């Protein structure tokens, strides 16, 4: 769902990003394919024309937004679980009825235009990923994330999650895992080369948080490939590094 929707694409990098929705192609109205294609083309042309006419404003907005991400001065809170909520409004849409060839008004009573965060985390300075975990290291390499070796310095604290239990949560009509976790100070030792350090002060910093937090709806742990990172009663292998 998240990959197909482009949520790990340009939008999360503070770029002006659009998703143009269309019919799913599963209907039987083949005779309407021309109108559907022309409708898609019209929408795409409108977006391109708008971008061309406002290119200076868009480029400046994107550049300013990306500077905030790279500097680490972005919003310290990151929502890793959210839901669509109602604000009490009803949505009225005027449509043309193919049956009667007249205008008709469709009223959406269960209208949920507000995106409401239900679980936030404070963005850490970065994460420590075990260098021996090939699957995680492959993920880091494929996304070309900025990382370095880590030397434990004064002024930072290291935390590790314990997986207390694993529940479930509805995510846009999909049921995904929702682990209950507890964060505590890391008491182990960190040898040279044991971990790589991925800072959140980089262009893909928000993506890093969404990917590596165990309660994230878009986290790596929601994929079968990384399911072994979550084990009830055990420690989560990725560590959080925060400034004291």
Regions found by a protein language model. Give the residues of each.
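Hard-cation-handling environments
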Residues: 1-158
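Catalytic centers of hydrolytic enzymes
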Residues: 139-142, 148-149, 165-244
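Beta-rich nucleic-acid/ligand-interaction surfaces
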Residues: 153-169
């Amino acid at each position: 769902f998240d990959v197909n929707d482009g949520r790990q694409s340009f939008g999360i990098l503070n770029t002006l990003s659009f998703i143009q929705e269309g019919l799913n192609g599963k209907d039987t109205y083949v005779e309407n394919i021309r109108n559907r294609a022309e409708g898609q083309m019209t929408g795409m042309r409108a977006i391109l024309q708008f971008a061309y006419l406002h290119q200076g404003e868009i480029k400046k907005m994107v550049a300013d937004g990306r500077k905030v991400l790279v500097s680490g001065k972005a919003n310290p809170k990151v929502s890793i679980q959210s839901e669509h909520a109602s604000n009490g409004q009803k949505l009225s849409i005027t449509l043309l009825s193919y049956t009667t060839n007249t205008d008709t008004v469709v009223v959406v009573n269960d209208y949920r235009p507000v995106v409401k965060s239900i679980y936030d985390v404070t963005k850490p300075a970065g994460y420590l990923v075990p260098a021996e975990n090939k699957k995680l290291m492959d993920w880091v390499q494929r996304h070309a994330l900025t990382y370095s070796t880590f030397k434990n310095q004064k002024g930072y604290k290291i935390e590790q999650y314990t997986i207390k239990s694993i529940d479930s949560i509805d995510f846009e009509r999909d049921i995904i895992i929702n682990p209950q976790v507890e964060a505590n100070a890391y008491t182990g030792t960190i040898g040279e080369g044991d971990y790589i350090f991925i800072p959140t002060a980089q262009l893909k910093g928000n993506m890093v948080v969404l990917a590596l937090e165990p309660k994230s709806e878009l986290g790596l742990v929601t994929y079968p490939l990384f399911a072994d990172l979550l084990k009830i009663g055990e420690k989560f292998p990725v560590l959080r590094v925060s400034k004291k």
